[in-house]
Amino acid sequence: MYDLTFLLISLFPIDITLPTRQPQNKPFLLPQATYETSHNISDPAVSLHGLKMSISTTETDNFKPVHTLVSSPVTIVLTGSLLFIIFTGFFSFFFCGCLFRKLMRIWNNHRNRNRPSNLIQPSNPPENLGLDSKIIESFPEYPYSVKDHGTDQCSICLTEFMDDDTIRLISTCNHSFHTICIDLWFEGHKTCPVCRRELDVEDRTSLEKPLEVPEIDLVRSEIHDEPLPRDTVTIIVHEEHPSTTIGSLEHTDEIESYERRMKASNLRFWRSHSTGHSIVVKTENEQEEEEEEEKDEIKIRIEISGECQFEDHKMTLPNRKLYCVRGTYSVG
């Protein structure tokens, strides 16, 4: 409001006259002389009184009333016109903005109503950053025992393992964690928390693409006393629990080194007499290999005796591969 008043005053100045002192043309006569002359009084007290009255009369005559100039009608009309233009422009701008937003909202609603529904496609689901649940379940769980395993701690929560804690073992790298901790970790990661080994590549390949090996014929023969060939390899397998899953042979390198020592000393594995049965494995390329040198000929002989169990295992022999996959013997 003060800014508007200042603007109006600066645009339309108002002429205001202030009171001014008007000079007197008539000469100033000494009051005492005039008074004494006119009244013929020589008393000092009377002269002083007459001087005061003369001064007051002179001051009254010197001042005139103040006259101010009132604003003209033209100034009032111009001020009112300016205010009307300002308020009209402001309200017009505000009204046009509201009207434009209303029209845009109506147009968008009309366009969305006429749009075909088949054009609306759902967004792609986010990619799963965690490990597959099948791979997680493939890692074994076991209750922890301080007496058997000693003192150890979980690398995720940094707390020591206590008795009867459920532990999950990552068989790929042999690292153990609390089941709850490692399951939460696998929801957003695919690696081991300790060694950062990628667990998704190898495990997914083994789950989705099982090992394909050709089947071989197992020939069961009755007990016989004829000597075995020098290059025959005999593997002892128990048959005490036929329905039990065949176990795993670890330390493949030790088996191969032991085999080489046996061949160097011209020793052989003799058949087991616990059950009196033996299995001779014959391959399709046996006839071709018989024509080769004797050192390259290998015959695999599997005898069922009744002592050990094997799980999934892969043992490499010279020029041959023996696969023991859950009870199915295969040679590649």
Swiss-Prot record:
The chain crosses the membrane at residues 76-96. A zinc finger (RING-type) spans 154-196. This is RING-H2 finger protein ATL81. Pfam families: zf-RING_2. Its main location: membrane. It catalyses: S-ubiquitinyl-[E2 ubiquitin-conjugating enzyme]-L-cysteine + [acceptor protein]-L-lysine = [E2 ubiquitin-conjugating enzyme]-L-cysteine + N(6)-ubiquitinyl-[acceptor protein]-L-lysine. It comes from Arabidopsis thaliana (Mouse-ear cress). Keywords: Membrane, Metal-binding, Signal, Transferase, Transmembrane, Transmembrane helix, Ubl conjugation pathway, Zinc, Zinc-finger. The RING-type zinc finger domain mediates binding to an E2 ubiquitin-conjugating enzyme.
